[in-house]
Every structure is written in C-alpha cells, then in structure tokens.
Amino acid sequence: MKKLLLTTVCGPFGVNTDDCTEHVMPELFHAQVTRSQGIFSIRSTYVSYGLEYIAKNIKTPTTVLQYPTMKQFISEVKKGYAYVGISFVIATFEKVKKMVKAVREAAPQAKIVLGGYGTVLPECEAYGDYICREEGVAFMQRLLKETPDDIPPSHVVYATSGKILGFPAMKGAVVLAGLGCPHGCEFCATSHY
C-alpha cells in the first residue's frame, strides 16, 4: 500500500548550520510566530495545520512531521513512502533543495510534492515531481486518485482524556472560512492564493 509523508522544512532556524540558512530569522520561523520585538517578543509553538488538515482528509496512510531535524527527516524518508510532500515559504527554499537531495538519495522511488507559498518561485519546478499551487486537500485527492465523496470530513482538533483545552469534549464542527495567512501584505506571496 502506498504511503504519504508530509513535512514542513527542517529545523533549526536562525543559526548558521549545515542544514539551515542563517538569513532566516528565528523570530519568524523557529516554531514561533512573532516579529523582532526584543525581550517583548511573544513565543508560541507554530503547527502547520494545513499539513494536518490534508492528512486527516485523505484515505492514504499519512505521516506528518513538524519542523524535523534533517536526521529525523532522512530517518522517516527511509521508511518507504511513495510520496514525500514538503511545505515551504520563499525564505526556506534553500532548505527545500537540501531536503529534495536527501529524498533522492535515501528513497529514489519516492515522488516529491512541493507546496506552500514558496511554490510561486518558478525555479522550484526543477525540484519537485509535482507542484501544488492550489488547495492542498483537493490536489492530494486527485494525485492519490481518491474521490472527495469517499472521505468524511475530519478535523485536526481531538479530545485528550475526554477534554479539549480543559473543557469536556462535545460533538461539534469546525468551519474554516479560509486557509493560509490572512494578512495579504503587498510584498508577500500569500496574496497570490
């Protein structure tokens, strides 16, 4: 049975190491959502919910990695995936190149899917077998030959010990008014979508 690996780019961020680029500010990308505000910067763990949302809404067995180290990524790639999907932004394209090279060496049979805002770069086409420049669930369903009718909608929030954020779990639904960054800054590629 075919398997899918979905991942963000590898960490760490904001330091000069072999597996990352020093020009990427840790304030924005080291699993944090903040701007350079010095000691007043609020730290927060950032989860790429888009990847989780895709994984929950396809039938193909899927593993999601959130900011793995390169070592963790390569170890997972070696587990025999048919597809490896990498989500990235423009600032992390150099990392994507290294990750693609690692996939080609560790699992040459795997097809690489590139997605996220970084796909506005025309040069990314040379690195992926498939480029997702649209809504991810529908794209993956087509790629994996799954029909939307086959899969009941599933949400990424789940109860732990019968509770969600400390409250008793109840039946309900999540309505997503939109996916992706809501800001639409003129200088950013997110407005492209």
Predicted regions and their residues:
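Acidic, low-complexity intrinsically disordered segments
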Residues: 2-193
